[in-house]
Each structure stands twice: as C-alpha cells, then as structure tokens.
Amino acid sequence: MINNHMLRIGALFLLTVLSYGFYNAFLPITDPVESNYVLSAITMLKHNSWISPMIYDQVWYDKPPLTYWALMISYKLFGISDFTSRIPNTLIAGGSVALMYHLVYRIKESKHIAVMSALLLFSAL
C-alpha cells in the first residue's frame, strides 16, 4: 500500500516534470551554453564516443561528460530535437523538487513545511 508521503512525492515530481515539459516543448535552443551541450552530445553520438567529449569533430574536455551522456541517452531513446534535449534536465528538476519535499519532511516532520519548501524550489527552477 502506498502511503500519503509517497503520493505527495510522486505528485510533486509529476507536477514539475509536466509543467517544465510543457513549457520546454515550445522553446527552441538559443542559449550559447545550451547549444554547446547539445552539439557536443550530437557529435559524440555521431562518433559513438561515450568516453571523450567532442565538439566540431574534435575532443573537447571543457566539462565532465555526465550531461552529455544524459543527452545522448535521450537522443537514442526519443530522437534528436529541442524537446528531447531538455528531457534530462526536466527529470532532474522533478527529482530535485521531490527530494526537497522528502528531506524537509524527514527533518522537520511537517507536511506543510515540506510542501512549501518543495514549491519554493519549484518556483525557482
């Protein structure tokens, strides 16, 4: 049986993922930093290079590869698009809000404070 605590965690995760997913569906990739991550992941996918980050067909050790790996997995599963470029970050945002609720609930033992903390983080993302 799922308790109310787990239902609230799931609801906060789902609220975050759906709202950010809906918002991200209409935004093109325009930020220069975001486009570097996307281009690097596409280049790495093209070369099947899961170890060395690449951009413009050159090795590029500017950032750790975890973000590139998440993007590459998203592209492998759903294809390359602006929307799928934002799936990993949307899932991380949902997990962050759910984790905020869970941790504050464990520390303060107050549902009200935990929900307010999670919603405050949600509004800042």
Where are these regions (language model features)?
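Membrane-integral, polyisoprenol-dependent glycosyltransferases
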Residues: 1-125
